[in-house]
Every structure is written in C-alpha cells, then in structure tokens.
C-alpha cells in the first residue's frame, strides 16, 4: 500500500490481489459508519469520508484490512489470501474435507443461528433454515418436535426420519437428537443427496443430519450464562358461535324438526337472556410460563481442553395441566497425550418429565379429547356450578335436550394425570493416533441408555357413560390407570483410518476406510388397566396398590434386540481444486433382515468442476465461485419398524370348546421371508453453486430419488388362512428442485444478511406389492375410511370425498339432483360424479392432496452497531387439509356448538340459502349431510412469521466496569403470526403423527403457541 496526496474529503484507490490483479466487488467501508462503496471492474473505488477516518477493505477469501486515512489519499491496496477461509472444512461422514473439495449437496446451519431461539428443541429451530428439508409442526404440545423430511417421504410402512449423527454417533432416535441443548451446538450439516450420505449406507436413505457440539478451547477458563423467561399463548382460536347466535341456532333447529314444544325452559332462557356466554377455549387454554437457562465453562491448554455445560428448561403447556421439564448436563475433554496421540471423552445426561393431555382421539364421529369437547360445548353453560362442581350436561342440564355424552373439558384436563419420565445418557470416547504424516487412525466407542416410565391415572367420577359423579358426589365404583416402563441401550464401536496427502502441490487425496459394530436392546413392561371398588391412589411408588375387590388385568412385556455391522471406504480426489471426484462404498449387515439378504451393498460417486479455479477465470474477480456438481448413489433404510419382520409369528383366536373346557387355538399370522432385504434409495443430483461480488451466493440442486420399499403383502387364501408377509415390493419416486439464495446487501455498521430457501418436491408411487393399484389400509379413521387414497402413478396422500355443489332450495331441486339417501329442502347437494342418479361412496372424487406445491423459508439478520434484529419467515403454497374435527361439531349434531362459518352461513330459507356449504339447522337427515365431503376441505397455504428476535449488546466499556467480557439482552417472539385461510388451529396437521400416507387430516390437535421471551446472555 502506497499513499499519494490528492484533494480533500475524498479517498480514491485500487484494490488488487497478491498477483497484482484488480479485485472487482471488494467492499470499502468507513469504520464506525454505514458509509461505503465497492470496487469497480478495474478494482478502482472512490469514497467521501472524514479526513481522520479509518477504512475497512474486505473480499471473500481474503484477509480484511483496516487502514487509517490521515489525508486525502490515492491508495493501492493489496489483499492477502485468507488461507483459513480457503482451507475451511465441512464435516461429512466419519471426518471432514475442505469446502473446496465438496462435490455433493450439503447445507450448513451455524449453531449461533439457533441457540438464541426460544424453542423446545433443535428441530423447531431448523424450520426455514435450509432448502430441501421440511419440518411439519404437527403438535404444539410442550416439548413436541416437528416431523422432519429430507427431500420428501421415500417409504410407506417404514420410517421416514433422517439419520442423526451426534458427534460421530449415528442414530435414528429423534428424541436423542432433540434432547441436545441448542446452546451446545457448534454447527449442523445436512447431507441431502446420496453421494454425501451413502457412507452411512443402510441408515442414510432419508438423508443425514450431522450435529457437532461445542468442544473445549485453548485459553483461560471462560464462563457463559444465558437465561430466557417468558410466556406462551394460543396463536389463534377457532371461531365458533357465541351464546346468542348459538341459542338462535338451536331454537331454529328444534322449530324445524318440530320438537321445540318439548323444551319450554330453552325458550324462557332465550327470552330472559338468563344464560352464560362461556368461551370454552378460554377455559381450557392459559398463558403458560416458560424458563430456560444454560451455564457453560470452557478452557484448557495445548495439552488438555475441556467443556462443561448444564441446562434447565421448564415449559408449561397452553392447555391446562400440561408441561414439559428437562434438566441436562454435558461435559467432555480432549487430551493431546503427545504430538501424535489424542484422547477425547464426552458424556451427557438428560432427565425429562412431561404431562400429557388428550387433545384428540375417537368417539362416534372419530373425534374426542379436550379440544373437540371445548369446541362442541354449548357456550350457554358455565364451567363450574355454584358449589364448585364441574358443569356436566347429564347432571345439570338434562332438561335442555343437549348432548349428554359431552364431558366438561376442564374436568378432563384437571382430573387426569398422564405423566412420562425419561432419563437418557450418551457417552463416547475416542482414541486417535497419527503415526506418520497424513495418516490418522481413530477408534471410538459410544454407549447410550434410555430409562422411561409412563403413569396414567384418571379420577373415578370421570369414568363410565353415566356421568353421575362429580366433586361433591364422587362415583367411587371405578378408577382407571396403567403403567408402562422400559429400558433400552445401544452400544456402538467405530474404527477408521484416514490418509490425506498432497502430491506435487496439485493432487489432493483423502482416503478413508472403516468398520462399525452396533448392538441394540430394548425391554418394555406394561401393567394394564385396573378397576377398584374403592378410590385409592392408582400407584404407590413402584407398584400398583392392592385393594380388596380390585380386578387387576394381565400385564404384558416386550423384548427386542438387533445386531449390525458395516465395512466402508471413501475416496476424495481433486486436481488443483479444479476437478473433484468423490466415491464411497459400504457393506452393511443387520439381523433385522432375512438370512439370505442380510448383507447389503451401498455406493456413490460424485464429480465437481470448480470453474473459478481455472486459469482463464483468474481475471474475473467479480465471480467468487462457480461450481458444477453431479452425483449418483444408493443408500438404504432400515427403519422397518420391526426387528423380526422376516420371522414367522403365531397368534391366538377363538377358543374351541370341548365339553365344558375351552381350548385356545393358534395359527400363523405372519409368514417367514428369508429373502427380506433392505429398502434401497437410488438418487441422482445435479447442482450448481455461484457467488458474485462478495455479496450474493446461489445454490441450485435438481434431484431424483427412487425408493425400493418394504411392505406387507397379502398371502392368497388358498394357503388355508389369510395373512401377510413382509417383502421387498413397491417403489416410490421423489424428484424436485432446491434453490437457496444468500446475500449481504449491506456491510459495515449497518449490515443485512439474508437467506431465501425454496424447495419443490414431486412424489409418486411407482408400484405396490402384489401388483396392487391402491395401497390398502390407508384410512383417516372409521368415519373417514377410503378418504385418504394412495394409487400407483399418483402422489401419496390423495383425498377423495363427495363434492358439495350447493343446497336443495326448492322442490325443483329435489327432483333435479341426485340424493344421498333421504334428503329434503335445506340439505346439501352433492355432485353425482358417476351419473348413476344416486349419491354414495362411488361418487367420491379426487378433491385434493396434502402435499404442498412448494415450501420456502426466509431468514434475515440486521445489525446496526450494537443492535441486532433477526426475522425468520416460512410457509408453503399448495396442498390441502381436511378439518375432520369439524364433523364432531357439525351443524346441529346433538345441538353442539359449531364453527361460526357453518352456524352463521347455514341455510335458513329458499331466499336465505347461506354460504352454500352448510345445511339447515334441525335437518332430519343429519347423516346424509355430515359425511366426508368438501365442506371439510381447505387449502393448506400458509405464511408464518416464525421468529422475531431483537437484541442489544452492551458496550465493552460498560462490561469492563462491571467485570464481565460481554453482555447481550434480547426480546423474542416465536410464531408471531400465521397468514392462512384455515378455520382450525394449524394447517400442519397429521392424523397419524408421522405418517406419509394419512397426512393432512386435522382431528383437533394441540395448537401451536405464540411465545414471548426475554433473554440475558453474558460471558466472563
């Protein structure tokens, strides 16, 4: 750098690299301000600034320079390459490679992006952070984690969860992954294509998420503490009728069906206005307090480094009497025994307790639980009686003709105890030797345990259908309770040898071979329901109390284990970082599969061309990176749900009576298949990475994945008895495109970093077992059978129902349109799809699918001096959701309350026909109107402001005065607002929790909460 005087208040110059070539797009900022510029195509710049100021010059891949300007100068600035940036490594399976040598589809999420979010677990923090990964928050229950999908669902009967690799330990246990304290995470790598994940073979078919936790750092001890306190509330309420509108509706209904004269008290109440206006959602929901705290100490020397942390989380649920508590500790050290020998130990223990509630379930309309009860309860009734008893319709309002089967949802919440405990441990130790330059030998041992227990107890007066008991008059004839307890452990041993060498400065080679061994064991025992003649406590310490007259049903137990081992190898080669080749091969064996197909081979290959490393690109400085990638690989899926799927099973059935003696009969219910093998995924990927002007980066990936799946196939009846056998039959295809755009539009005292991710996945069933055209047993409940359908040639999760086209308004309509059984004026008209003149199940037609057209996420970080603001937005376009819970409170069903759109939009007369989707109140043909139809179908589009966080970092001068290194205070809102057109709580619904075939059906699950928190972080 040379200085030459020139005019005042203006600095000009040129930015070059160490070869003297001008750099295009270098950022030149006046320190302490937002005043800045960038260098032009010739590397020149001009900046108006204070004569005594300082400028910062930066460019990707180069070391930032800071230059003090005393006068108006003409500057010649030479930037040196940042070797640390150029040699930045990316964690991949069983090691790490230089980022420039990556030829596969990998996304990175830094730990700092998620540690400050007030979420219950890591999965919630990943929402919207990367393309190609979908996280569906199907429940707002405290501690509940979203379902994770990497590039769609590739299996029908088996699991679709990705493989989690936690500090080198591979597991499909999502709970173990979500038990990690977010503040302990250094970074997360998401391996999306087969070439990056095939090194994990049979476990990697659904993608791989690699978690690296924080380790000890050289230096004097550093202590950090963070705490967050706040509250949660229901993000939205379902809009149901208020008391006046409800009274008008049920009086109209009973007038229409001719029964109004039987309920004079109802008319008297309406005329006098002597009734409540209870919001039952207010009664069951609350503002729930939450608290999180983490303390960490880290430090060490060149010989020994350590890191210890402890965390506590107390999260009350927005439903009464629900909560999640977690306490965790983590520790580890790393010792350099010599220049060539290293030893490391890590351990963690997590204790959690959760109180569950029953938001969903099944009754005569396949909907029960406190959510459906609260939405169905008449708003004219109080929550409590004057004597403190819970209001129960059967006990207190039988003369109003209301639904006697409805229970008070508040009593169900407060009088149930359904608790789950868990103590989980994870420990690992490794020993690493570098006998010669470039060669690393490493062996590691991991051991995890899980001790769990669940106790369920329901107060006596809540049982039975008589509903005769209450607080003041308990029904002591029965109680209900059960206990589940279990213990499992997993032992894992891995040994690798890695050789990394550079030949003639241009040939870079990284080769690795290894061996894995794993043993897993699980045991569970259940003590089933009991009925007592008294009302004792259901459980006393560790055993069921024994009461005279008690009937203790038989318990059950279950034990399973499996053994697994693997051999694998990987080679990464690049020529001068221009041309990259990567290949891997792996052979797995597992006792889960038949002896004849117990071993499986998995392999991959990938190529990359770093265009910007070519000599002819050296003068193009505005182009930071341009890389083409292509890969192909085969991975597997061993999450088949049964450790003994290939073995024959025996079941018992009806007893045969000989004289007066009943003899049980046994028969084969599952047939042996020694040929049962792995689910396999074949995936191709084409990718392109580009970065320009040190400010904009774009990553695009196209992929196609074909999955050969395991599923049960029916045995022909001529074998003597019906049954099924697990076999390798059927194929699923997923193909799509992912785009991720990262930009830094502003730098300096005011900076803005933004990342937009967009993903589109198309899913299709290619074939099924026994040449079936439709997957059997896909149902959304007994009242919704054959609504969710899965056909060959179609995506999973098609929705078939009757299509509502209006209401019968006149006698002419009754004569013109086909009827669904008996129907009258004011009932719904359904489309006669097959034109046979009758409405029945044969008129079900394709009306939607749960899978979205595309998903997106948008992350923004704004920094102005010591203030920072982070905003995360995510959502989806396309797809549908069935609001099945609404059937339980359909218009005029037992005079329960209803959705406002149905109640206020109901048919009233031939001149007031309502919204065309709601029949008249008091119809005598209720069953003909409330079956599966498009009246329950809604678009699943949504845009959610997922996270907003505002922080302030105190000035170092102030921190020094109070004796700390730094301090940050923050305020955060999680799930601030959701924009959608859905009347339920959330469109992210799933009938079977994690199902790929029965998704998109909402039975009134636990609502997602809006959470406000205030945080404090400081370091010593």
Named regions from a protein language model:
Residues 114, 119, 160-161, 291, ...:
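Extracellular/periplasmic, surface-exposed regions of secreted and cell-surface proteins
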Residues 123-129, 729-733, 774-799, 846-857, ...:
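C-terminal extracellular loops and terminal segments
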Residues 239-241, 457-460, 527-531, 874-877, ...:
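Short Gly/aromatic-enriched secondary-structure transition segments
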Residues 269, 464-466, 549, 876-968, ...:
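Extracytoplasmic gating/loop element in the C-terminal half of outer-membrane beta-barrel translocons
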